[in-house]
Amino acid sequence: MEPAADSSSSLQTFQTEVTEDSFGKFILTCNIARIRGEPSNVYTGLNIGCRLPECPPENPFEIYYLMKDSELQENNDWIRLYLELAVATTDRNREASDFGLSNLEIVNVAVDAEGLLNAKNAIFYIRYKDLYEARLGNAVFDRIAIVRRIFDEDTGRFTLVGQNQSSDIIN
């Protein structure tokens, strides 16, 4: 944290929280940090817009914007975070040591949003290979993580909602 321009001011402590709204479902919310002690008028109930995204009837990788390799490299940190959160929060049957999150290989990403990658509200279709599952001999290792990103400027609430599905749903 950088000190304020006025050298007489002290450092401020900010507070925020990230919550998992439902065990085993990828519904994570984070309220924007505010100075500790300031009143909060943030709505705490589950927003109707937070329903789990579903795969459209058409192949999302053919109808929505397909990220270029250079865009994937440039935005890999947060795309990868979305993918890892989707896998870790929806597959609770794996032991923590078995998650193999490093064994998730992103194949391609489609974006459904106005403003594309910089949109505050968007749905990301992340096709990936679960190389951990492939090594176990499981047939379903080509998967899709569907992640909805929602940012409400009025409340300062940031929400990620998502799920994993077999890529067979689009073939």
Curated annotation (Swiss-Prot):
Pfam families: protein_MS5. InterPro entries: MS5. Belongs to the UPF0725 (EMB2204) family. This is UPF0725 protein At3g25080. It comes from Arabidopsis thaliana.
